Amino acid sequence: MSDIALTVSMLSLVAVLGLWIGNWRIYGVGLGIGGVLFGGIIVGHFAQRYQLDLNSDMLHFIQEFGLILFVYSIGIQVGPGFFSSLRVSGLRLNAFAVLMVLISGLITAAIHKLFAVPLPIILGIFSGAVTNTPALGAGQQILTDLGSNPSQIDLMGMGYAMAYPFGICGILLVIWLIRLLFRINIDAEARDFDSRNGHSHELLQTMNIMVRNPNLSGLSIQEVPILNSDTIVCSRLKRGDFLMVPLPTTQIESGDLLHLVGQKQELENARLVIGEQVDTSLSTRGTELQVSRVVVTNERVLGKKIRDLNLKQRYDVVISRLNRAGVELVAGNNATLQFGDILNLVGRPQAIDAVAAIVGNAQQKLQQVQMLPVFIGIGLGVLLGSVPLFIPGFPAALKLGLAGGPLVVALILGRIGSIGKLYWFMPPSANLALRELGIVLFLAVVGLKSGGNFIDTLLNGEGVTWIGYGILITAIPLLTAALLARLMIKMNYLTLCGMLAGAMTDPPALAFANGLHATSGAAALSYATVYPLAMFLRIMSPQLLALLFWSV
């Protein structure tokens, strides 16, 4: 069997064994995707014992490409809501991430000085304890630049392997302990996130208001500023027994009933200006109007603003809501359409059919993946990650690397949505498949590489001591941040899990956190919010530690 065929076979074995281990449940908690790492350690141990020759270049490529696939798909998933989340809670989340990085760095420095642990080994333990492979590479590079002995630099990998397993398990354990300690109800936390954090757009409300302000009588909809804004949509107007879709030029009369859609505060402002709230139903039942949901799939309308389609004047149809990546937005005139947007239409059946034909509404297109944008995004991400950042006093340039670059690019492209005929929308099933494939490949290779000398170092060397150091570097920052976040500011549990995973730059922990609730995107959103800064700080930390203690 060729070395390539053998390598693929071993990776498949690792994936099967690891996923099986990940499905084991102890008190309802399992390793999930993190089980692949331990499957890799087991297979790696026996591979070395029986002297199986695996292709190292192929393993290196698979490890890096798997990580790229994972972080890219995460970025595309959370991109549409990332920047709004950053405005709402990004400062607070990133403050906790910085706190965790700072504490882990201080503990590492203390262990190095108090126990005289060689610098290459403690930097390897640090990288493994915070589950950051790019930090390992950055540490090895700066030690090389500083003239360290190559044999000592190789010890970094062993320290990394000793600390990495608990780095993976430690965050899962903390997530589990916080859940038990505070008696967390996952469904309640998901609902709380939807109502309070970033998804407040989802809870768009409606209000029926009767026109009582005499100053509005005779004015058209577009002449009333509160009704001609991007924060409120007037989707129906009832005059007597007649229900209609109001046009911008439709004149308002005293006694008219307006059905408005928007956020609560905006609706209250409209009520103060227009008149009084009434409980009268403005349902389309029994009328010639109907409400339908259509999806944007026509490439010709991508990037166009709602006002450019002129649907009210041409078809007497109004878009009352716009759902993008699970977040409901007010369909203001300046809202730009993206592939996969779901539009809530109100109008006559024939007119709605005509509008549906314009925007596409081709459900089968939602299951198709444009591969060209995927590889454009990955390529741009790798280029960004390779750009060196020179800082005075640093002998080596800092880089976002193959994990940070693709994530940042994916966040931006996910937010943009489309450029011309290229769209970065990815069906949830395809996104999940890429994400899971990527993390399985990454962990399988890390496990295989760590497994060879893992048992020997654990039993006959200083492995147990190194693991103890790693536990301190892993557990203390996690517990400190988790308890402070939950006790001081009552942080949502799912958001907390994503923040911890992001601050540890730990994809398996994110996969575990995502699995806590089937539909909530809270963990992924907070992960992506803190990940770019955390990744930068994690890469910079071993370089700072090396510079501080090299000549001391």
UniProtKB/Swiss-Prot annotation:
UniProt entry keywords in alphabetical sequence: Cell membrane, Membrane, Repeat, Transmembrane, Transmembrane helix, Transport
GO cellular component: plasma membrane
Cellular localization per UniProt: Cell membrane
Domain (RCK C-terminal) ranges: 191-276, 279-361
Transmembrane segment boundaries: 4-24, 26-46, 65-85, 90-112, 158-178, 371-391, 403-425, 439-459, 464-484, 493-513, 530-550
Membrane topology: Multi-pass membrane protein
Annotated signal sequence range: none
Location (main, coarse): membrane
Gene Ontology annotations of biological process type: potassium ion transport
Protein family (similarity comment): Belongs to the AAE transporter (TC 2.A.81) family. YidE subfamily.
HAMAP family: YidE (MF_01016)
Full protein name: Putative transport protein NT01EI_3867
